[in-house]
Amino acid sequence: MGIEVELLDYGATLKSIRVPVGDNFVDVLLSYPANEDYLQDKVYLGATVGRYAGRIDSGATRVQGRSIQLECNEQNTGHCLHGGPKGFSHQFWSVSERSSDHVSYEYVSADGDQGFPGCLTTRVSYRLLGSNTLQIEFTAETDQETIVNLSNHAYFNLNCIDSGVENHELMINSGLYTPLGSNSLPMGEIKQVADSIFDFRQKRCLRERLYSPDAQLDLAGGFDHYFLLNKDVSKAGVAATVYSPQSGIMMNIYTDQPGVQFYSGNWLGAPFKPRAGLCLEFQDVPNEPNMDGFASTILRAGDTYRRQITLEFNCLPGNR
């Protein structure tokens, strides 16, 4: 048996990944009971997020030397979050290709959509590789200079029963992270993870870290921080690993993205409890257009944005 994947046209959403464990399957993603529930979603459950994943400070930035005001949708901060109130996560995508092992979606975002310049054509492809691996590929092209930062917002829970993720073990192949300011955004500062609760270079139990006294955790109610991945990750190194000792399921993630936003599911809302799932949003740094020292998220006409995220699942011996 191999993994089984379920997708939705709305948000080009990754709804379900069922992983074989013994004679049964474990769905490792949080999902709503009915497909119609996704139309009211407020936490981006499994969705493709864009045009810009993460927050942009007050929705204000500059492109081609001119000021741009984006639509803001995060009520408690006034920021533009995940592309605005009608971003990619809240749109119906067209199926451009379909076969037994892959589906490709396409969405055309008009010039000025949510305040972003340029007509942007975006494609998201989900492809099964072998029996235990799912590859997600994002591509985008524009007719004028704009900013692009795409990711998937799946909430993972590798346990085989209805429980949270605090018993999960997490490894992030990163020696650097970006602290948050009081406005829930990176401040442009980069810190070493060494000798801090942000050191996930070896697998760590989330429960041990989540309840450690730390001002950064207090700001976000847990983890909601960006980690810069080590350089060797893009050369087929493992970017992150999640393991559940309860189910025995291990997920290794590979990517060519420069970093990952780790969100410990601090605020989910009904029907979910806090920390029912965790997010690993592989992407560029939030608010990059307003900071110096990070890789540019500018996409120019004639160029192609292309990024991949690969999820590999295994069940460790003794748990089958």
What is the meaning of each model-derived region?
Residues M1-R320:
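An exposed, glycine/acidic-rich loop-and-rim segment of catalytic or binding clefts
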